[in-house]
């Protein structure tokens, strides 16, 4: 079992199929949040992809870049997560407008590998993201925490989402708070 994945998918943001969706359904579906993808991104997981030639393992980060990058004849059979990632310290945080099970303003999944944090977000942009640049800034131990967080905030790789759930400035405020939480709870 992968505790971070279990925790993240418990509160999937899809009102139409609550408690009935598979991990593959969440990731391959049309909803933009795809929260089930976050733990797979931070754990450098692989997707087992099938097509007419057989099965192959593809890094999750390679088949999901802003959107799912599968050919028409391909489908995901399963995911491979190295055991070492299932035992690392982790943090899951979800901020919603009103309810525990709702579309996220931001969902965060983070793990601490060695003394480096890896983190992925849903609801921050129009698609789930893992930004190595944001991680590098947050992991820059030579800088004070406040400066690391400010540089990480400036490194969000795309426009911050603005929709009926919340404004871009509010999401940025939440992101800053969540980065402080990552720093304090995972000790970076």
Regions found by a protein language model. Give the residues of each.
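C-terminal structural segment of proteins
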Residues: 1-188
